[in-house]
């Protein structure tokens, strides 16, 4: 597939570990954690950056998905400028004076879009990753398995869509920071840390469209299976059979559902 020039430039930057603007010592690129736009399956400790334990989120399908990260601490893709500087140790894609202007260094401060052509290109590439993969857990003809079909009915009956609703299985999709509602479903613990250095009162609800691919679940990777992640919620107990069926449905939610 031929990429638009801006998207192609962004992809080049995404995979570049040698550009000193992107990382110190040539050891890290965006693709180090997000190869092919996916996730490395690891949990990172961002306590020193005002957050806490955070499992890497895939970038695929996230275009236009509203606030970013588990704590919704970014409101635009260009906010990765701060992570380039603080986490990767890069010099940054925008000039220091532009980054320090007004409240721009604050992830939720003055907009960063339109300041640096290369930063906008990087954002354009990430925004181009707008497709989820199909779930390999479905029947060969693409239909839900019997347990998953029963789990779909449970999903509706138990009100799961109150957080995981809509076309993206995420009620926060497309939300502006002012409209964002973070949810605490009982999974926040001391190791969850903070949000932008302040109290973490909830988690930005993730989409379920690629939950099957996570490898570890919840914001801190503390759940070893989808069933464990569901059981960790404090939203009501489920019997073993219902839990198994609900987990089967979530596992089969991909691009098809």
Regions of interest found by a model, annotated:
Residues 1-257:
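Periplasmic c-type cytochrome electron-transfer domains
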């Amino acid at each position: 597939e031929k990429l638009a020039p801006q998207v192609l430039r962004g992809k080049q930057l995404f995979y570049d570990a040698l550009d000193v603007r992107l990382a110190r010592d040539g050891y890290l690129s965006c693709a180090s954690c997000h190869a092919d736009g996916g996730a490395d399956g690891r949990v990172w400790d961002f306590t020193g950056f005002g957050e806490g334990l955070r499992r890497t989120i895939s970038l695929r399908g996230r275009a236009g998905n509203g606030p970013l990260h588990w704590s919704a601490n970014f409101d635009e893709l260009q906010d990765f400028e701060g992570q380039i500087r603080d986490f990767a140790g890069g010099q940054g894609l925008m000039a220091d004076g532009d980054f320090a202007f007004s409240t721009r260094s604050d992830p939720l401060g003055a907009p960063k879009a339109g300041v640096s052509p290369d930063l906008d290109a990087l954002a354009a590439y990430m925004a181009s990753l707008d497709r989820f993969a199909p779930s390999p857990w479905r029947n060969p003809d693409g239909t839900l398995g019997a347990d998953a079909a029963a789990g779909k009915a449970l999903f509706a009956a138990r009100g799961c869509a109150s957080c995981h609703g809509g076309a993206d299985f995420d009620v926060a999709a497309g939300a502006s920071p002012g409209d964002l509602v973070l949810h605490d479903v009982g999974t926040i613990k001391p190791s969850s840390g903070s949000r932008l250095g302040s109290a973490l009162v909830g988690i930005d609800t993730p989409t379920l469209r690629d939950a099957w691919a996570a490898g570890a679940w919840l914001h801190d990777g503390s759940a070893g299976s989808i069933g464990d992640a569901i059981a960790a919620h404090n939203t009501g107990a489920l019997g073993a059979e219902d839990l198994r069926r609900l987990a089967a449905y979530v596992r089969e939610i991909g691009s098809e559902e």
